């Protein structure tokens, strides 16, 4: 790591001077990525009233001159902005996460910290090989600051196509940038041409208001950062990062999504031995018998956790419900539920228990609930229906993650929250929803949209179901469910979401009444063997709505997931990602409608090497899963 240096610009940082009509010297700062693929230019506007930036990728301007800055409740800026002192830094290192999509992440960038006369903040800009990021850093002497809105623009081609959603869990649709009329979620994927894709988003959001993207002048290509409320500080502070990534294929952007982790602080949990990724089964009956059955099933099938969802402490939406008591909601289950008995039984079997707690209880009782659940031996909590958007709730949620870490509790957050990389700093933050998952019965084309947009942000809990009728009726096939479990990354992977194991009680019209029983069929071998975190990840092919082909490595094994959308595909996948000189057994899970089985999953085994090519035809709205094991 290089230390910051003053007035000694690395090769990738260029300072351009221009003489104005008033014989004043104006600066333009140009910062390039280490591989020179990205270049960020910063200058003042013609009348010196605004800061402007632009971004080039491989010689193509992907963000035309765009305004930077904020609006404040009180005027803090002067009429003239001048670029002042510049501090430079370069980084060339890597780091190993507690868990991830890769076992090691590169962190290579050039950086400038630019000061200004006339402004209360500096601008920190980083040029990575994966993209550009910048944030605003407000100084100690700024006093109390109230930000009413953000002015940061992204000036894009008006005719470029973007995949957008209004909410974190709503449908993702494709439209021209010029047609965007309301605030849209981040990250946003934009296609400029057949060989140029751009992603815009936010990283390092901890105690600021969340950003969305809005086109305030429909018909143009100018998107503006739209804050979900005002922001107030009475101390020095930094804004979240705004990032722009680009690549020739959407899969290359997805492969580089660790950029968001790089833009967060390193791990602050000294002892991480208690942080455990794994597969989770939900206990759907809220009964002792059902809990025991789930524990036995988890132990038998290499699952790591059992989760009790809403209802174990009463009606989750009733403020009178007390999350320090075990009081089953009678509308969800007749019980009985001896929860502590199940937790102790699970511990004997090496299985962790996760409990759901709605935000209503957390906001009132979090300082009581966390130590209590720790004393019960609970492994983690699923925070339910958390508030997102305004600064108040952003700050509350991340403080709630930190408080959970103090009690050695892992966290899964539902419903609208999307990650911005905080799991690097607090890796007990295992996963989150903020995704159009199986609860929404998303079709495969929508899932593929999700993979290439939402998953840029990081892990997504999409509640993978398997035996539920909706799989065949609405969601494609059972093999596409398998493929999703590979393609949609989540360190806590919830499987068999709407299902229950043999031994769970059936109560007509109540808990367990219409929930399918998990049959002990060969398909389960796939989920038994499935890891949830990885040593390496490669996106081999894909395009939103049409196709996703992703391979992931864990130890000596590789897993391939392929999902089709609106069209069928004849896959031809070179297996050159496998180790050379080694034979592998490929266990292939494919859809075969002719089979007289409920899931229509055909399982076959073949021998392959890294010289082999996998040839498979996949129907539209379908999928394929393959496990490669060394022989």
Regions found by a protein language model. Give the residues of each.
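Bacterial N-terminal signal peptides that target proteins for export
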Residues: 2-11
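C-terminal motif of bacterial Sec signal peptides marking the signal peptidase cleavage site
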Residues: 20-21
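An acidic-aromatic substrate-binding cleft motif
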Residues: 237-305, 309
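Carbohydrate-binding surface patches
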Residues: 543-580, 624-625
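C-terminal beta-strand-rich structural cap/linker in extracellular carbohydrate-active enzymes
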Residues: 605-631
């Amino acid at each position: 790591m290089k230390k910051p240096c003053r007035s000694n610009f690395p090769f990738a940082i260029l300072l351009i001077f221009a003489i104005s009509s008033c014989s004043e010297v104006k600066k333009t700062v140009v910062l390039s990525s280490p591989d020179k693929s990205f270049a960020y230019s910063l200058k003042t506007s013609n009348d010196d009233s605004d800061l402007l930036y632009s971004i080039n990728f491989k010689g193509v301007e992907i963000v035309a001159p765009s305004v930077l800055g904020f609006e404040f409740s009180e005027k803090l800026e002067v009429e003239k902005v001048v670029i002042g002192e510049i501090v430079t830094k370069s980084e060339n290192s890597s780091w190993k996460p507690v868990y991830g999509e890769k076992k090691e992440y590169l962190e290579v960038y050039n950086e400038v910290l630019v000061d200004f006369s006339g402004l209360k903040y500096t601008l920190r800009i980083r040029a990575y090989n994966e993209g550009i990021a910048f944030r605003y850093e407000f100084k100690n002497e700024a006093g109390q600051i109230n930000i009413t809105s953000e002015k940061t623009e992204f000036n894009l081609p008006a005719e470029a196509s973007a995949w957008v959603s209004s909410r974190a869990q709503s449908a993702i649709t494709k439209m021209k940038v010029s047609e965007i009329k309301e605030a849209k979620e981040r990250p946003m994927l934009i296609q400029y041409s057949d060989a140029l894709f751009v992603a815009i988003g936010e990283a390092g959001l901890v105690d600021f208001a969340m950003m969305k993207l809005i086109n305030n002048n429909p018909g143009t290509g100018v998107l503006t950062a739209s804050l979900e409320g005002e922001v107030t500080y009475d101390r020095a502070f930094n804004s979240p990062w705004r990032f722009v990534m680009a690549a020739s294929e959407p899969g290359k952007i997805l492969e580089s999504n660790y950029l968001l982790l790089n833009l967060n602080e390193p791990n602050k949990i000294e002892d991480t031995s208690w942080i455990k990724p794994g597969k989770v089964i939900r206990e759907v009956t809220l009964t002792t018998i059902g809990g025991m059955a789930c524990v036995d099933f988890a132990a038998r099938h290499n699952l790591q956790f059992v989760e009790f969802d809403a209802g174990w402490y009463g009606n989750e939406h009733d403020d009178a419900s007390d999350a320090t008591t075990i009081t089953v909601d009678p509308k969800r289950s007749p019980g009985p539920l001896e929860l502590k008995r199940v937790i102790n039984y699970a511990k004997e079997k090496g299985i962790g228990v996760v409990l759901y707690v709605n935000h209503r209880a957390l906001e009132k009782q979090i300082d009581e609930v966390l130590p209590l659940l720790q004393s019960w031996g609970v492994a983690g909590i699923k925070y339910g229906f958390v508030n997102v958007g305004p600064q108040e709730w952003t700050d509350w949620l991340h403080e709630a993650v930190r408080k959970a870490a103090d009690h050695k509790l892992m966290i899964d957050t539902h419903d609208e929250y999307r990650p911005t990389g905080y799991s690097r700093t607090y890796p007990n933050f295992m996963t989150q929803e903020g995704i159009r998952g199986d609860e929404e019965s998303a079709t495969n084309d929508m899932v593929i949209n999700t993979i290439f947009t939402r998953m840029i942000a990081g892990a997504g809990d999409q509640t993978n179901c398997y035996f539920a009728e909706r799989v065949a009726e609405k969601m494609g096939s059972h093999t596409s469910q398998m493929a999703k479990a590979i393609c949609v990354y989540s360190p806590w992977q919830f499987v068999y979401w709407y299902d229950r194991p043999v031994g769970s009680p059936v109560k007509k019209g109540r808990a367990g009444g219409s929930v399918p029983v998990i049959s002990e069929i060969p398909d389960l071998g796939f989920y038994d063997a499935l890891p949830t975190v990885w040593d390496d990840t490669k996106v081999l092919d894909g395009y939103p709505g049409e196709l996703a082909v992703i391979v992931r490595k864990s130890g000596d094994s590789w897993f391939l997931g392929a999902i089709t959308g609106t069209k069928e595909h004849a896959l031809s996948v070179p297996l050159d990602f496998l180790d050379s000189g080694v034979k592998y057994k490929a266990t292939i899970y494919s859809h075969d409608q002719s089979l007289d089985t409920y899931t229509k999953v055909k399982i076959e085994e073949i021998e392959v090497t890294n010289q082999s090519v996998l040839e498979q035809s996949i129907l539209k709205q379908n999928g394929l899963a393959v496990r490669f094991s060394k022989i």
